[in-house]
């Protein structure tokens, strides 16, 4: 099965198995940031190795925040949020790298960086 299809099906199954809004909004933000940073790190593995190490540390910090704030039984919802955010961030990064339209590529790169920067700022504050 294609990797993208596996991810889509996982999101679909996890989303159907959990109630929306089942957790704290801050926990959701942590999970979304974990997904974004994970996609960013994977992109950096291919194109900017040294930056991936810094992103891995940031991801580790966010995962620690998730573990500290996640109530028992909310793991599926948290994973669904992470996967959704990772897929979205990965899409932006792919557009930034491979779009034939330069304006689209620039816009996608700026948006991907802005979203990752929001997560980094949350860790530092």
Task: Identify the function of each model-found stretch.
Residues 57-125:
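Compact alpha-helical subdomains of small soluble proteins
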Residues 1-8:
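Bacterial N-terminal signal peptides that target proteins for export
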Residues 9-14:
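Hydrophobic helical h-region of N-terminal Sec-dependent signal peptides
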Residues 17-20:
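N-terminal signal peptide c-region/cleavage motif recognized by signal peptidases
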Residues 15, 38-39, 124:
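Charged, amphipathic alpha-helical interaction segments
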Residues 22-26, 47, 104-107, 111:
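Non-transmembrane, amphipathic alpha-helical segments
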Residues 24-79:
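Short N-proximal segments of mature Sec-exported proteins
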């Amino acid at each position: 099965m294609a990797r993208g299809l596996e991810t889509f099906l996982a999101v679909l199954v996890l989303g159907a198995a959990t109630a929306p809004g089942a957790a704290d909004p801050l926990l959701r933000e942590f999970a979304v940031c974990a997904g974004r940073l994970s996609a960013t790190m994977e992109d950096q593995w291919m194109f900017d190795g040294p930056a991936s190490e810094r992103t891995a540390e940031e991801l580790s910090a966010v995962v620690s925040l998730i573990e500290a704030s996640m109530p028992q039984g909310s793991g599926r919802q948290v994973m669904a949020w992470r996967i959704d955010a990772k897929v979205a961030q990965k899409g932006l990064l792919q557009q930034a790298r491979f779009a034939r339209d330069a304006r689209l590529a620039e816009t996608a790169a700026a948006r991907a960086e802005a979203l990752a920067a929001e997560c980094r700022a949350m860790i530092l504050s």
